[in-house]
């Protein structure tokens, strides 16, 4: 296994491992794998939609809408119906798996088409990979609230809205102002960590 391949797949898989391990009530391995692979497959329609709707990089922010909408559809129409999808943290786990499956295949596209693939792989491990992971966490958190807490459609809306908004804003500044891009990313990571921590505390209270 060469260095470029390791740099491409290791960052998303490490985050996947952390999210799965942090879940106090583990999910079936088979469903985790199929969800991750589904995220990979979503790259295909996403690429087609992005090529059609995004004429050049100045419109890259529109990718936030197409990509997060596809991830949301996967959670709503596939994950929601699974019997093992039975508590709020599950939504974060599967939301992150879909997002990082997507990010992994996308990583191959960017890294192996770059002039300096190792540099791009390292750069994306600190930018695009955390972006996708955190959007998955946030989407999952609010989707879990909708399914398991109150059936409030506002939470269903937030699930998609926040993911699209953060992703689109990140992409917008990525082509215009790198400093603001990193500020958006820091805010996104902080927000996602806070939501994940809330559900970890809730799980611990159920164990006691």
Regions found by a protein language model. Name each.
Residues 1-208:
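Hydrophobic alpha-helical segments at protein termini of multi-pass membrane proteins
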């Amino acid at each position: 296994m060469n260095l470029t391949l390791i740099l491409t797949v290791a960052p998303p898989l490490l985050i996947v491992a952390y999210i799965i391990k942090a879940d106090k009530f583990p999910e079936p391995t088979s469903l985790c794998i199929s969800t991750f692979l589904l995220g990979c497959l979503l790259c295909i329609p996403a690429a087609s939609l992005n090529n059609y709707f995004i004429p050049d990089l100045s419109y890259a922010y529109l990718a936030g809408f197409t990509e997060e909408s596809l991830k949301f559809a996967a959670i709503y129409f596939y994950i929601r119906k699974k019997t093992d999808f039975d508590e709020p943290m599950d939504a974060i786990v599967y939301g992150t798996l879909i997002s990082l499956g997507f990010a992994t295949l996308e990583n191959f596209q960017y890294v192996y088409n770059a002039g300096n693939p190792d540099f791009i792989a390292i750069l994306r491990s600190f930018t695009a990979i955390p972006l996708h992971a955190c959007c998955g966490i946030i989407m999952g958190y609010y989707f879990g609230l909708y399914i398991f807490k109150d059936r409030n459609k506002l939470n269903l809306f937030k699930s998609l809205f926040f993911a699209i908004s953060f992703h689109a804003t990140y992409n917008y500044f990525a082509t215009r102002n790198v400093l603001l891009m990193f500020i958006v990313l820091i805010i996104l990571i902080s927000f996602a960590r806070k939501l994940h921590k809330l559900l970890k505390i809730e799980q611990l209270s159920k164990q006691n």
